């Protein structure tokens, strides 16, 4: 019987948050358990997840501040308690969340006397300040302080060179690392007379996202790394060795089941990959979100003609989407519905 010939894996991974707490306003902690793994698998996943958490998750940060009539960062302003240098340090500590992949501008315009906090920062709706009570400066006199802030989204950290900035622009050593720490441990147990493993994963975040959100994003980023392998097409050269007799060469096993893999990729993997991974400009991204296109799978239901009919979605936005799909996932949308 066909049923007897098919071997189905009974190993279904399950995860559970077993501990969660707020250690401080800017430090969230959760501990997750993921199992069951076969022997050796938990360590492989643990290493990959920890590195993805620490290195692949984007964060938002202020990258520079523009203050008129100020020559250098150690300048002082009459009526302002802090030096410019102190203000820059305080700006660096502000925890932000950005829904845009494009640099954004925000502004501080305060008339003293007043204590200035992150709540006084005014910016676009795509920028969210996580701790509004974060201290910035104090005005002791009846003076106006105006600061323009540049906010970017990136990975890792960035130390700017002051010399490349014009007078009045002050770089901030930006930290784009919402994950403060990540650890894992592996423990063995016996199940059905077989040795299985359970992975414990600990995640600390700065509050701009929860540990659960971080776990999802790290998982999506790892999936993105392998999608191109699944979608890879035959090349004229394989690992740098020229094919002299194509009929005698053996290819990756993917190729013999390319149709099945393509269907699996569209039906399963793309449902878990959000359009954020396309890194589209804010205009194209926001237009897609307004018509409930949240994942790559949602986007695959559209043709080029469908996209251009979306409100405020111009030809340039269509080109940006097509280019991003081709670059990231080797996907080309059909011209019209007839080819879907």
Curated annotation (Swiss-Prot):
Q: Where in the cell is it found?
A: Plastid, Chloroplast
State the residue spans of region: Alpha N-terminal domain (alpha-NTD): 1-233
* Name of the top EC class for this enzyme: transferase
Annotated stretches, region: Alpha C-terminal domain (alpha-CTD) = 265-340
Query: SMART domains this protein is in?
Result: RPOLD
Which spans are transmembrane here?
none
Keywords, A to Z, come to:
Chloroplast, DNA-directed RNA polymerase, Nucleotidyltransferase, Plastid, Transcription, Transferase
Chief location category: plastid
**Anything noted about its domains?**
The N-terminal domain is essential for RNAP assembly and basal transcription, whereas the C-terminal domain is involved in interaction with transcriptional regulators and with upstream promoter elements.
Which family does the similarity line name? Belongs to the RNA polymerase alpha chain family.
From the Swiss-Prot or TrEMBL record, give the protein name: DNA-directed RNA polymerase subunit alpha
Give the organism's phylogenetic lineage.
Eukaryota, Viridiplantae, Streptophyta, Embryophyta, Marchantiophyta
